[in-house]
From Swiss-Prot:
Free-text function comment from the UniProt entry: Protein-lysine N-methyltransferase.
GO (cellular component) term, any one: nucleus
Entry protein name: N-lysine methyltransferase setd6
Gene3D superfamilies: Rubisco LSMT, substrate-binding domain, set domain protein methyltransferase, domain 1
Provenance organism: Xenopus laevis (African clawed frog)
Keywords carried by this UniProt record: Methyltransferase, Nucleus, S-adenosyl-L-methionine, Transferase
Taxonomic path: Eukaryota, Metazoa, Chordata, Craniata, Vertebrata
Length: 455
């Protein structure tokens, strides 16, 4: 599901069609009514990574690539244990909302008589993508320090273990006729979490329902055969459409014979792609690249800049107030894209509050953060406009960016030299290459911030 680097080109691309797992899977597709356009085929040759879909001949914009009937989708509503899951639904509530699907996968993926057995056969032993959560702790720390991925995967692993021990294992124990703790283990559960993370789809809510729905009503994930074989790039050429009867993959631009068909997983930065899917787009292909400055790092910068103990106490008061009005949080981040600030309101309000005079803050606090409409609140803050922010704001942002860069184990110049040296880059392992792409993209944005905020 994700690019390491271009593999072999199109010589012998059809050889996989004769391999038993894919032949069996394609026969299954026909049996369940999953229709593929004859202009496309599934292969591991000529794709950016693992399985992928390529064009046999030219395909027009808007052309249907395949349809997946709802009955072929694997979800908590289509599994053979659907009634059991419904009966136990109260005990299967979790923060992730994934437990019913994961239990469905535990059951279906370990039973050779499952309707979806040919689908699971594409991944022997259910080997997950090479996601950082499966790297050694030493490799995680060495390659991912400062990127945000390290904290994300440690949080994932903690939550997975807690979820398995507190919800899934008791369920398994209560249902010995279908499950076995020796078979449906924590290790298998982790691999299936990675499987869902990398390959599942979430159906969007109807537009007219979005305002009424809260987070707990978000539709659960589901596994969509064939759709999950398409790789991702920011500049994709296909997208998935949802209808009451089926899901349809349709081209969004014309595709030439021999080219790969790409879906999109959304506007995702490289650190998110590496964390969730195990890959990163090579620079400069990912137009959705971002860099984060942790909100607590700005607090640290404000405290460092304070001249006296009274000033530090004042900064802490202001930070507490920003937390009170829910503008910042201990785990939040200010997000900077290639062209715009993604968290404009949070950034502007935080800089304003931390930099205003005592008198201004007293009045601002009295109004609980409300001000008269200044007329530009809805405008997007473009990256280049940061240089026009008030001087105190720029100084605080500059120090925040400097502190953020200190979290990385290497300098931008070292990363740049590696990325631009084809020979040296080729000698890196695939994990090193992907991690390098993440760090390089983030540091470029942070260094741009340093330039825009320098005095």
């Amino acid at each position: 599901m994700g690019p390491d680097a271009k593999k072999q080109k199109l010589e012998g691309v059809d050889h996989l069609q004769n391999g038993f797992p894919v032949t069996r899977f394609l026969a299954w597709c026909e049996k369940v009514g999953l229709e593929l356009n004859p202009k496309v085929y599934i292969s591991t040759e000529g794709t950016v990574s693992q399985y992928g879909m390529l064009a046999r001949e030219d395909i027009a914009d808007g052309e249907l690539l395949f349809t997946v009937p709802r009955s072929a989708i694997l979800s908590q509503n289509t599994t053979r244990i659907q009634e059991l899951l419904e009966k136990e639904q109260e005990s299967l509530q979790s923060t992730s909302g994934w437990v019913p699907l994961l239990i469905s996968l535990l059951y279906e993926a370990t039973d050779s008589s499952s309707l979806w057995a040919p689908y699971f056969g594409l991944w022997p032993e259910l080997d997950p993508p090479d996601m950082p959560m499966f790297w050694s702790e030493e490799e995680q720390t060495k390659l991912l320090q400062g990127t945000g991925v390290l904290e994300a995967i440690r949080n994932d692993l903690k939550n997975i273990e807690e979820e398995y021990n507190s919800i899934v294992l008791p369920f398994i124990t209560r249902n010995p006729e279908k499950f076995c703790p020796m078979k449906h283990t924590l290790d298998l559960y982790k691999r299936l979490v990675a499987f869902v993370m990398a390959y599942s789809f979430q159906e969007p809510l109807e537009e007219n329902d979005e305002e009424d729905e809260d987070e707990k009503d978000i539709l659960p994930p589901m596994m969509v055969p064939v759709a999950d074989l398409l790789n991702h790039v920011a500049h994709h050429n296909a997208h998935l459409e949802f209808t009451p009867e089926c899901l349809r993959m349709v081209t969004t631009k014309s595709v030439h014979a021999g080219q790969e068909l790409f879906n999109t997983y959304g506007e995702m930065a490289n650190w998110q792609l590496l964390h969730m899917y195990g890959f990163a787009e090579p620079h400069p292909q990912n137009s959705n690249e971002t860099a984060d400055i942790q909100m607590v790092t700005m607090r640290e910068a404000a405290l460092q800049a304070a001249q006296t103990e009274d000033d530090r106490l004042e900064m802490q008061k202001r930070w507490d107030f920003l937390c009170h009005i829910e503008m910042v949080g201990e785990e939040g981040a200010f997000v900077f894209g290639l062209e715009e600030v993604m968290t404009e309101e949070e950034l502007k309000v935080s800089l304003k509050v931390l930099c205003m005079s005592k008198e201004e803050f007293a009045e601002y606090k009295e109004n609980d953060g409300w001000e008269e409409d200044e007329g530009d609140d809805e405008q997007t803050l473009m990256i280049q406009e940061i240089s026009h922010l008030p001087t105190p704001w720029r100084k605080l942002l500059h120090l925040s960016a400097k502190l953020t860069l200190k979290n990385y184990s290497t300098e931008l110049s070292m990363d740049e030299a590696l990325v631009n040296n084809i020979t040296a880059y080729a000698k890196l392992s695939s994990r090193e290459q992907r991690s390098l792409q993440v760090k390089y993209g983030q540091k470029r944005i942070l260094h741009q911030l340093l330039e825009l905020t320098k005095s």
